[in-house]
Amino acid sequence: QLKDWLNEKGIEVDSLAKAAVEELVENTQGDVAEMMKLRLAMSKTSVKKYEAMERSVCPDGRVHGLLQFYGANRTGRWAGRLVQIHNLPQNHMEDLELARSLVKEGRYDLVELLYDSTPDVLSELIRTAFVARPGCRFIVSDFSAIEARVMGYLAGEGWVMEEFRGAGKIYEQTASKMFHIPIGEITKGSPYRARGKVASLACQYGGAEGALISMGALNFVEEEELKGLVQSWRTANPHIVNYWYEIDGAVKAAVKERKMTKVGMVTVYYQSGMLKIALPSGRVLSYVRPRMTVNRFGSESVSYEGIGTNRKWTRIESYGAKFCENIVQATARDV
């Protein structure tokens, strides 16, 4: 329908993919440009959740099966299904109840009059579409910086654990360690805190410049700074970096020599054609048909068989820091 409408306006398009629509926004004016902006807004993944809700609702008016036990392949974490409730947009609107009642009553003219962006309103109202059964309530919570805590604990990074025993300002403390600045000088809006935060999120599992870029680092630092950020974070976290290499060595020893190695609180070994990693909880991660391979950089690495990013059974190449990610996320799941 939209293509037909554009044809009536004298504009022929082969595709309405995001890139094509963005180009039309730049190169058109008036109602065409406005329509393309609306198209972009309505294609937001969060708004599409309403369609998922409609598809998933059962005869009793409720949605069932939103969480799959042990849904994640290698870590065993719970997996979101159907509506993906693990990543619902946050609420920031002050008059959320008013917006909800207007949409519920179908008074979209007032929504357009009172709010700048109808799609943004719909996005914020997604959480309010979930209603607990009578006599029950939803409690929404999570563990604060759980992966940073678990990684610091497993790797024995003393200052990280000390910070979590106290104020828990891991991003500020990371920036303080990276840039040798007193933590009291690093406020929430500080550019140093922003650097500490993005480095903490991007570098914990061996990430380098590419990981920083994917986390949005170029929004506030120059590209030439990225290598220095990676090095500063690794210098500030020597035990975590060493943990990557210890796990890497243990995994290779298990595959090549069938050797059992204890690395801190985890045990790595080979059994019945599988690489095994025993977690502090006693649960064991298993990697099918592991073998030594040469990676794309020409270095020796371990690969195993599993479901790849293409959702097909394939051979997956891995390395120490990636195994650490599995270990940390699985341990966090056990918590």
Segments (PLM) and residue ranges:
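Short, basic interhelical loop/turn and adjoining N-cap
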Residues: 216-229
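Core structural elements
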Residues: 1-8, 174, 178, 194-211
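Short amphipathic alpha-helical coiled-coil/interface segments
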Residues: 2, 6, 39, 197, ...
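Catalytic palm active-site di-aspartate
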Residues: 142-143, 209-212, 229-232, 335
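Active-site-adjacent structural elements in folded domains
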Residues: 179-200, 215, 322-323
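Acidic, glycine-rich two-metal-ion catalytic cores of nucleic acid-processing enzymes
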Residues: 1-186, 243-335
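Active-site-proximal binding-pocket segments
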Residues: 209, 236, 240-241
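Small-residue helix-packing motif on alpha-helices
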Residues: 186, 212, 225-226
